[in-house]
A protein has these predicted regions:
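NAD(P)H dinucleotide-binding glycine-rich loop of Rossmann-like/cofactor-binding domains
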Residues: 83-166
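Mid-domain Rossmann-like dinucleotide-binding core that forms the NAD(H)/NADP(H) cofactor-binding site
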Residues: 130-213
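C-terminal hydrophobic helical "lid"/dimerization subdomain
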Residues: 230, 274, 278-326
Length: 326
């Protein structure tokens, strides 16, 4: 089969690789769409020791089951494979399983390929009216769904339901959409890039600004750099909540004194639970997350150029979806 293989820092190649082989209780999936995630970019830039070359990246994917009793079923893939036996798994927090695996990280190859093998329990069927490109957005949308859910659960019930989202990339946009789906009507996205901001404003569905002087009960940091954490620390109201989902850099930015004296809650949020993933998929199917028309589709064979364009900051769309059969 063909795959886009990470071969070293800023090097990916579209080439032949051994066919994906399902294990026991797994299905072979013909990949129809796979999105480029920020973590794929971290690996591409050589910033992720967990993803050593050579490796097939990609974990945001949808496709069709090949063979077996579910042959032909259209599915979106939950890439987190958990043990199902530990206390975290049994309590519905599979994302905290100590033995979890994820495709695109050894020992599991990723979805920037024509085929991938996945456990049956990680597949959610996709109705015919939902495109594969839209279904592939379930994974990044679930990341934000999880962050928003935790943030709203922590928010004091007397506080206004309004939120600031820092960052207009896919995770930030997804957070704004999840907030709206959870009945938070006053949502502002801060995005400094003129091109990205103009692109998002053109959709007409999002309130995107370059900067704001307001403060907010809930702040979602969808970037995760010291500068954005500093902004979150400044913009959150006393008694409010910061939900941190971005993984830009490891340290710096938080005003711990202010957070302590004003009882600001800080929540680290990692991926999603299986239930978050299912709920996100259903929200997509029901149209509660909008038209999801803020993506750019490219052929997987042109993946090297897509990574370069993202590296050079010349992509206006929040998400590039790679199509293996284009």
């Amino acid at each position: 089969m063909k795959a886009l293989v990470y071969e070293g820092v800023e090097q990916v190649a579209f080439r032949d690789v051994p066919d994906a082989a399902p294990r026991e209780a797994e299905h072979l999936i013909r990949i129809e769409a796979a999105g480029i995630c920020g973590s794929d970019m971290h690996a591409y830039l050589g910033h992720d020791a967990r993803r050593p070359a050579p490796l097939i990246l990609g974990h945001e994917a949808a496709g069709t089951i090949v063979g077996g009793p579910r042959d032909g079923a259209r599915v979106t893939i939950n890439p987190l494979v958990s043990c199902s036996k530990c206390s975290a798994c049994k309590s519905g927090r599979e994302n905290l399983c100590a033995d979890r695996q994820i495709i695109s990280m050894p020992p599991r190859e990723g979805a920037f390929a024509q085929y991938v093998a996945m456990p049956a329990s990680n597949l959610v069927e996709v109705p015919a009216h939902v495109s594969f490109a839209m279904a592939a957005l379930t994974e990044p949308l679930a990341v934000s769904w999880h962050a928003v859910r935790l943030g709203l659960e922590a928010l004091h019930p007397t506080m206004d339901r309004k939120a600031l989202v820092i960052g207009g990339g896919a995770i930030g946009v997804a957070a704004a959409l999840a907030l709206s789906a959870m009945d938070v009507d006053d949502v502002v996205i801060v995005e400094p890039s003129d091109g990205r901001r103009a692109y998002l404003q053109s959709t007409g569905a999002l309130n995107v600004v370059k900067e704001t002087m307001q403060d907010f009960p809930l702040v979602i940091d969808a970037v995760g750099f010291a500068a954005t954490r500093s902004m979150a620390s400044t913009m959150v109201q006393p008694g409010g909540v910061i939900a941190h989902v971005g993984l830009g850099e490891d340290a710096g930015g938080l005003d711990i004194r202010r957070m302590t004296l004003q009882e600001i809650t800080f929540i680290g949020t990692y991926t999603y639970t299986a239930e978050d993933f299912r709920q996100t998929a259903q929200a997509i199917f029901d149209g509660r997350l909008g038209g999801l028309d803020w993506v750019e589709e490219r052929a997987l064979s042109e993946g090297a150029e897509a990574f370069r364009d993202l590296r050079n900051g010349v992509v206006a769309a929040p998400k590039i979806i790679l199509m293996p059969w284009a």
